[in-house]
From Swiss-Prot:
Pfam entry (one): PRAI
Catalyzed reactions: N-(5-phospho-beta-D-ribosyl)anthranilate = 1-(2-carboxyphenylamino)-1-deoxy-D-ribulose 5-phosphate
Family stated for the protein in its record: Belongs to the TrpF family.
Pathway noted in the entry: Amino-acid biosynthesis; L-tryptophan biosynthesis; L-tryptophan from chorismate: step 3/5
Stored SUPFAM superfamilies: Ribulose-phoshate binding barrel
Record EC number: 5.3.1.24
Enzyme class, broadest EC rank: isomerase
Name assigned to this protein: N-(5'-phosphoribosyl)anthranilate isomerase
Length: 217
């Protein structure tokens, strides 16, 4: 079954709604430039009240490894999702407060060799692939072209675990999941009323669509 991450959680109601709908993981965005930014102390207060067996993921863009470690330890995060090219192999292995998910944007110069080399240098095996938009480290709301996504995830199977992101919503996630076959899918804007505020019905519809896609495999 494809795992599901609901990202951009900013309040307890959205967190619990995501969990009860069937999400496997919640994402907390610690980039101050994001409209979904959440203070670490607020994230901790939400995480402490979550039901068991939910993975908590921190989204990092501008923090140095020691800052990532501090937030991971404070918030008891399971995973650190590292965006932007600033997170070289050397910096990624310096993150020890949580397991690392490295984000790659599928721009015009992207090749799977970049992922393979990164995995060999770091031992990291979890990768999130997002659509490329100049000047945006992630959360673009744009979909990765289907043939490109299929190629990326087919090749990623031999390297680690691939997470599909970029423009996923209840209306398109079933097809994306059944054709690309990612380990997990990730959405933020696809289930929102506005940045940082979720639509609980959209969350339920998104989760149902992912589960329904299993019938198409």
């Amino acid at each position: 079954m494809t795992k599901i991450k609901i990202c951009g959680i900013t309040n307890p109601d959205d967190a619990i709604a995501s969990c009860t709908a069937g999400a496997d993981a919640l994402g907390f965005n610690f980039s101050k430039a994001s409209p979904r930014y959440i203070q670490p102390e607020t994230a901790l207060s939400i995480i402490e009240k979550l039901p068991p067996f939910i993975s908590c993921v921190g989204v990092f863009v501008e923090q140095e490894p020691h800052e990532v470690n501090q937030i991971c330890n404070l918030c008891r995060l399971d995973h650190a999702q590292l965006h932007a090219e600033r997170y070289t192999a050397e910096k990624a292995v310096a993150v020890r407060g949580a397991k690392v998910i490295r984000v790659f944007r599928t721009g015009p110069d992207f090749t799977i060799d970049v992922v393979r080399t990164f995995a060999e240098e770091t031992g990291i095996t979890s990768f999130l692939f997002d659509a490329y938009r100049p000047g945006q480290p992630g959360g673009t709301g744009h979909v990765i072209e289907q043939q490109l996504a299929q190629k990326i995830f087919r090749e990623t199977e031999h390297i680690g675990f691939g997470i599909l992101a970029g423009g996923l919503k209840p209306e398109n996630v079933a097809e994306a999941t059944s054709t690309v076959r990612p380990y997990a899918v990730d959405t933020a804007s696809g289930v929102e009323e506005s940045p940082g505020r979720k639509n609980h019905q959209k969350i339920r519809d998104f989760v149902s669509a992912v589960h329904r896609s299993a019938e198409l495999l």
